[in-house]
Amino acid sequence: MTYNTWWIKKDRNFGDLLTPYILDYFNIDYQYSGIESADIICVGSIARHAKDNTIVLGSGMINFRKEKLNPNADWRFVRGPYTRQRVIDCGGTCPEIYGDAAMLLPWICPEEPKEFKIGIVPHFVDYEYVKNTYPDYNVINVINDDPLEVAKEISKCTSIISSSLHGIIAAHAYGIPAAWVEFSNKIKGDRIKFK
């Protein structure tokens, strides 16, 4: 069976582009589709887009109180307990299985040798500011058509500072200590995805 699958492509954002790599890893046959016909959604703060019977694999939210999550979606696992609680609050059921599918990065993209003591992974809205403010640091751009290149750059660091959720998740997946930082107030949502 071929599954219609949706992920956010327009911003070329690291985390958003990981879904096809994860499905490939599990030999799941898929084709990109619009959200209205998606059978599967996976990586990203996209849980609010699940329709009736959409299979949700590790998606999360950006705003706890404002997002209406579809109780009729097939919630296999979600990013964290806040997303699960919101599914339940909206009348759905969801097992107590948590994790962002990006935690599988070390199996998909093996770790690179260490080159940098610190890597800074700004959210794409913060990139220019951080690049210009910290020119002497290894600033990793999450906007890349190949998200595995971003993962490789993160894996080359011994520690990560990030305003990007998937910068932190990737670091944790590779066993790299990571700290979340806010460089601006430009990131959408109520920061629930960082909890």
Language-model regions: role of each:
Residues 1-195:
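Active-site anion-handling motifs in enzyme catalytic cores
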